[in-house]
């Protein structure tokens, strides 16, 4: 389901812009339409009010929590969609949330579990927002990063539609919506045109073109230097620094040559380098460098004027890196079993109809 389809249904039921905004605001904030002294039957046209319970049930069925896996750095949710497919969302520290944009992924990064089975299907914009609604039914969400399963650039229309809603009725600051991509020229064309301009995270991982092709075999053929220049143009236009993502792989992209390459590419740029130690994937053939080595790399870049953050990869303590939780559940055969009870379903109802 797409958000535009929801808007069309509301309008077909007699909704004016103020009614449409009220419904979408309540949904994106995981709130009932009846709050305090505000009664929906006093606000909505009768035909619209009569159709809201059915619409609310459809929205609630878009995404449900199949299982939750607590960890030191946040909880990972296995989210079941209406057709039985599953994706992962991660409740991050400081009211952050990581959402998925596809079931599977076509990029096939060598160090990632998600792309092993290829792309299964796109998520509709409403399914993307539904992950935020699920999270908000559990706790506050003030930042959303599009860094879960899938490549957002390969589902651009749906992702941008979700961003537009979250940055308006959803009440999330534009710089707290982070679009992550391996690099696609369409992203740099489309993002500046939107009314909501998100922050941008670029998957760099290496400064060496040949190694980048090996690590991300089906990513667009963008030279790292060109990718950085495209990012810099967007950063200067929006006023948000580009976040460069770098998965640290021991003996692969953690040597002095790479450090010098980072300095060469990012010196003077409006950028933040995020070092993320590799989250082990069985059979991938990579290893995580020691924390001490990773910290030394970050210190070196700091001394050279590159703002660098060393981040924990969410889910390391529960073997729940991107795609791993879903793969483990599929391997166990648990997807054929009923989902856990979901008390956090959000349904748009009028008072007295629940």
Curated annotation (Swiss-Prot):
Domain of life: Bacteria
KW Cell membrane (keyword) present: no
Residues spanning the signal sequence: none
Catalytic residues (positions): 88 (proton acceptor), 322 (s-methylcysteine intermediate)
Domain Radical SAM core: 91-317
One annotated GO molecular function: RNA methyltransferase activity
Keyword entries, A-Z: 4Fe-4S, Cytoplasm, Disulfide bond, Iron, Iron-sulfur, Metal-binding, Methyltransferase, S-adenosyl-L-methionine, Transferase
Top EC group: transferase
Disulfides per UniProt: 98-322
Cellular compartments per GO CC: cytoplasm
Entry binding sites for [4Fe-4S] cluster: 105, 109, 112
Record-linked InterPro entries: Aldolase_TIM, Methyltransferase_A, rRNA_lsu_MTrfase_RlmN/Cfr, rSAM
Cofactor binding note: Binds 1 [4Fe-4S] cluster. The cluster is coordinated with 3 cysteines and an exchangeable S-adenosyl-L-methionine.
EC number(s) on file: 2.1.1.-
Chain sites annotated for binding S-adenosyl-L-methionine: 150-151, 180, 203-205, 279
GO biological process, one term: rRNA base methylation
Cofactor(s) listed in the protein's UniProt record: [4Fe-4S] cluster
A Pfam cross-reference name: Radical_SAM
UniProt subcellular location: Cytoplasm
Subcellular location, principal: cytoplasm
Family: Belongs to the radical SAM superfamily. RlmN family.
PANTHER family xrefs: 23S RRNA METHYLTRANSFERASE, RADICAL SAM CORE DOMAIN-CONTAINING PROTEIN
Name assigned to this protein: Probable RNA methyltransferase AZOSEA28700
UniProt organism field: Aromatoleum aromaticum (strain DSM 19018 / LMG 30748 / EbN1)
Organism ancestry: Bacteria, Pseudomonadati, Pseudomonadota, Betaproteobacteria, Rhodocyclales
């Amino acid at each position: 389901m797409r958000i535009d389809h929801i808007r069309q249904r509301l309008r077909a039921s007699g909704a004016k812009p103020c009614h449409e905004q009220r419904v979408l605001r309540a949904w994106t904030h995981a709130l009932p339409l009846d709050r305090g002294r505000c009664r929906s039957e006093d606000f909505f046209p009768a035909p619209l009010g009569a159709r809201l319970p059915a619409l609310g049930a459809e929205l609630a069925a878009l995404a449900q929590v199949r299982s939750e896996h607590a960890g030191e750095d946040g909880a990972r949710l296995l989210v079941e969609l209406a057709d039985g497919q599953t994706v992962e969302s991660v409740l991050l520290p400081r009211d952050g949330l990581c959402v998925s944009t596809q079931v599977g992924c076509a990029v096939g990064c060598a160090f990632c579990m998600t792309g092993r089975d290829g792309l299964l299907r796109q998520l509709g914009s409403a399914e993307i927002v539904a992950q935020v609604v699920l999270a908000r039914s559990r706790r506050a969400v003030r930042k959303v990063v599009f860094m879960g399963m899938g490549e957002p650039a390969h589902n651009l229309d749906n992702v941008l539609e979700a961003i537009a809603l979250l940055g308006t009725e959803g009440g999330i600051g534009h710089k707290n919506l982070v679009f992550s991509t391996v690099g696609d020229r369409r992203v740099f064309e489309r993002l500046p045109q939107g009314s909501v301009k998100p922050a941008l995270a670029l998957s760099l991982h290496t400064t060496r073109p040949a190694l980048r092709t090996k690590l991300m075999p089906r990513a667009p053929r963008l030279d790292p230097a060109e990718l950085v220049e495209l990012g810099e143009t967007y950063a200067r236009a929006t006023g948000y620094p580009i976040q460069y993502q770098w998965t640290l792989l021991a003996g692969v992209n953690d040597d002095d040559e790479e450090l010098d390459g980072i300095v060469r590419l990012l010196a003077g740029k409006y950028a933040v380098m995020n070092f993320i130690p590799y989250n082990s994937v069985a059979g991938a053939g990579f290893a995580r460098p020691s924390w001490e080595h990773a910290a030394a790399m970050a210190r070196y870049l700091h001394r050279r004027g590159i703002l660098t953050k060393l981040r924990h990869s969410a889910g390391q303590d529960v073997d729940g890196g991107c795609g791993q939780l879903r793969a483990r559940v599929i391997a166990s055969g648990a997807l054929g079993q009923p989902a856990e009870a979901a008390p956090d379903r959000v349904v748009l109802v009028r008072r007295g109809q629940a």
